[in-house]
From Swiss-Prot:
This is Omega-amidase NIT2. The keyword ATP-binding does not apply. Coiled coil: none annotated. Its main location: cytoplasm. Keywords: Acetylation, Cytoplasm, Hydrolase, Phosphoprotein. It comes from Homo sapiens (Human). One of its GO terms (cellular component) is extracellular exosome. It is found in: Cytoplasm.
Length: 276
């Protein structure tokens, strides 16, 4: 298959976990009725985003929230990228994305590698590392359409992760993410377009909808970018579903027209994976 429909769910997050999960499943069903074959939820889709919330909302995987995702993926016969949730495992907390196949099987689990620790004086200070531990592995999964590579939010700033995924044959990179009102307007779209052009892949980001009353205000603007760096679809700040038809023939054409993979000077430099 050379094309398929991708859907990104820009969900309004509340403080009530069960409501978030129920509403996420409702939007997933709606996306499936519109022909979406791969659907992504946003970062921290079942929880407010913030260090103080992670311990309270954390679950095992499998657990309550991911069981619902497994069920709805099977019901709708889709590939479901479950945004992320705070995961508890062996006394540690992680920011984790679980992926489910059309039969409800857990296909992949990705723990955010690069924790969001920043300090922009007078604007925003945040330290995920106060409560979360970093993941230590890459994660891809295969579909009948293409291979998909996973990252979460801050991971998008690290070009090496995207390069390794491209080397491993990924044609679509999906980053559930929640940039903020400082970094969002400056870097959200720029980073997506950069990763797409650098690696000649499709890049998709799924953000929570903006809630100006939240302790952490998400930028929104869930986006799909093609390998030419063009924005194919983009949400505003409100709750929405973003749809984009992914054309893999277009990707192949771009790679043929500008064959950077064949032109890389591997005799001079390399980006390599040190741990599978």
């Amino acid at each position: 298959m050379t094309s398929f429909r991708l859907a990104l769910i820009q969900l309004q997050i509340s403080s009530i976990k069960s409501d978030n999960v129920t509403r996420a499943c409702s939007f997933i069903r709606e996306a499936a009725t519109q022909g979406a074959k791969i659907v992504s939820l946003p970062e921290c889709f079942n929880s407010p985003y913030g260090a103080k919330y992670f311990p309270e909302y954390a679950e095992k995987i499998p657990g309550e929230s991911t069981q619902k995702l497994s069920e709805v993926a099977k019901e709708c016969s889709i590939y479901l990228i479950g945004g992320s949730i705070p995961e508890e495992d062996a006394g540690k907390l992680y920011n984790t994305c679980a992926v489910f196949g059309p039969d409800g099987t857990l296909l992949a689990k990705y723990r955010k590698i690069h924790l969001f620790d920043i300090d922009v004086p007078g604007k925003i200070t945040f330290q995920e590392s106060k409560t979360l531990s970093p993941g230590d592995s890459f994660s891809t999964f295969d579909t009948p359409y293409c291979r998909v590579g996973l990252g979460i939010c801050y991971d998008m700033r690290f070009a090496e992760l995207a390069q390794i995924y491209a080397q491993r044959g990924c044609q679509l990179l999906v980053y559930p993410g929640a940039f903020n009102l400082t970094t969002g307007p400056a870097h959200w779209e720029l980073l997506q377009r950069s990763r797409a052009v650098d690696n000649q892949v499709y890049v998709a980001t799924a953000s929570p909808a903006r809630d100006d009353k939240a302790s952490y205000v998400a930028w929104g603007h869930s986006t799909v970018v093609n390998p030419w760096g063009e924005v194919l679809a983009k949400a505003g700040t409100e709750e929405a579903i973003v749809y984009s038809d992914i054309d893999l023939k277009k990707l192949a054409e771009i790679r043929q027209q500008i064959p950077v993979f064949r032109q890389k000077r591997s005799d001079l430099y390399a980006v390599e994976m040190k741990k599978p």
